[in-house]
């Protein structure tokens, strides 16, 4: 298969046992009108035909992979949105905007549905969900397998609102880290959605296993429970209802965490990162003065950090002759990567190969104040806390780290904020209500600003004392790393209602 076509068209074909399970969720009779909007290699069609379904329609834009009397070899995106199907089933293509072909991008830019509900941050499969619902009859059923991140990402708010306004979910199967497709790392779900019907409760099948799914007996693999139907376009929580109640109680003590500002220093250095890293050699004093200490995700732990990597950073205007004269070791090391550095995208500006591209917020990071670093992404399947690290002055973040600064009008100490973010309550809140993709939590600006934050009531002496005790305990822990201090910190946090009891 053409690899570029596979990526731009999202061609990851569904295993037969998954197809059989999904068809088993259908309740319409064998004469029902059924649509498969992205047939791929025809595995859904073949299974439906074998089971006696005859009124079938399918779309597949790639005529090279299937030719079939039931298949229309054109784009489903341009199909007519008339409510005409009893059931729609399939595996829509998952493609990020940057991986779409120019023809696909133009098709979406010209599409009124895409313009109404989506944007260039959205995934291609969003429009397949929306158009499928538009083409269902009232009472019709949509059964799809797709990534689960539309439950939580900011860019899917329009899709979530559309789904709430046009029907209800009947069943959702959460695969989490279970392997469903070969070569696909995204966490996926199967859902059954009924158009125009208000279903009070959703049946959730939650599979908590990393083992590959090899059988159509899927429901025996996970925990089954019911949750109330989704009622807003906010993050959809699929955990059992008692967990949602506990999270709501925790939130009642808090406000959203707009008490910090999130910044980054570098744009992505990708594989050129090594070109700017300094090695274990005797650099000159001038070279050391033109370097910075950078913390990576691997250096971070809860509360503290374990080290840093030195990076070359020449800010003054120089030419290559000056580089050779004043920074001979830098010149030698950069020369090993020169060809690659010269090929970097420069936005049509002059970019010497020895300079970091698009350095941002440098003056902010150079302030003489502590800040909090956290990995941009964190796998949580075997963890019970995050790695919010209180970092010293003049330590800079690299591209796999998100940095948080306390705003000037915030009275709470940076130590208190660090303790709060490392609490079990915040961990559970992010686990169930944050942006989570396959047990990987994302710490970008929007997810961070959504975290509830427990402010101190400075009029209450008891709260002020707890705040000061937590501040001093964090400083003590950073000094001697005594594990018992963490228990004392948590006890004080719980006195402020910073806990989730599940």
Curated annotation (Swiss-Prot):
Q: Which domain of life is it from?
A: Bacteria
Gene3D superfamilies, sorted: Vaccinia Virus protein VP39
Q: What is its EC number?
A: 2.1.1.72
Q: Say if the entry is tagged with keyword Transferase.
A: yes
Q: Which InterPro entries match?
A: DNA_methylase_A-5, DNA_methylase_N6_adenine_CS, MethylTrfase_TaqI-like_dom, N4_N6_ade-DNA_methylase, SAM-dependent_MTases_sf
Give one Pfam hit by family name: Eco57I
One GO biological process term is:
methylation
Single GO term (MF):
DNA binding
Alphabetically ordered keywords of this record: DNA-binding, Methyltransferase, Restriction system, S-adenosyl-L-methionine, Transferase
Query: Which top EC class is named for this enzyme in its record?
Result: transferase
Query: Catalytic activity annotated for this protein?
Result: a 2'-deoxyadenosine in DNA + S-adenosyl-L-methionine = an N(6)-methyl-2'-deoxyadenosine in DNA + S-adenosyl-L-homocysteine + H(+)
The similarity comment for this entry is: Belongs to the N(4)/N(6)-methyltransferase family.
Its protein name is: Type II methyltransferase M.HincII
Gene name as annotated: hincIIM
